[in-house]
Amino acid sequence: MIHYKNKEEIELIRESALIVSRTLGILAEVIKPGISPKTLDKKAEEYIRDQGALPGFLGLYDFPATLCISVNEQVVHGIPGDKPLVDGDIISVDCGALKNNYYGDHAFTFAVGEISDDIKKLLRITKESLYLGIEQMVVGKRIGDIGYAVQHHAEKNRFGVVRQLVGHGLGKKMHEAPEVPNFGKRGSGRKIKEGLVLAIEPMVNLGTKNVIQLADGWTIVTADRKPSAHFEHNIAVVDGQPEILSTFQYIEEALVKQQASFI
């Protein structure tokens, strides 16, 4: 069952989403060769708690960390470890926060130092596909229109779109109905209505669309071990149109300060 949100609920979700946005902005300042994912995880937990919120992922389904940090061929759900990042890595950082009983949840894929042109393109196309999907989130359209927009843009650039992992509704639960696949047919699926809140999150691979789960029970990797990118926003339907509740502004400002390249 889909729970459509009123304006007060949407504002509470926005508050949690912006805590995540600011957390990712703080991490953007320090993501560089030599830092470990576990260090990033600790920094994120401290900041989220300082905002009077709780880490949204920690303990959820028994996940052991504040962040899902997925490096290179890891698609999602990577557990932060001690291995330092190196020049040329890409790192997806997925973060959640819970405040006032409502969740925020979004993600950004960062370049660590200098990355190759083909991986720069992967990041750019994945991010573009996110916004193309968001454009479809208008009253009267359907969930399949979102997936089609994401899939079409990624696949016309010869990238693989992950099938087994999807976006979702968001609210008092981290994962609410409906599921939001990153593939689909125009005019298919549930109708989009006023008050719908979604987490749209393209997961796009440099090579095959196929993925497997590692023995840790969490980490998803590409079957061909080629890199994967992941971007995610939280969006509400307000006055019939998509309104993005999260922002990448803090990340982009931090990356400019660091004189890092970003898409």
Locate the predicted segments by residue.
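Active-site neighborhoods and metal-handling regions in enzymes and metal-associated proteins
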Residues: 1-263
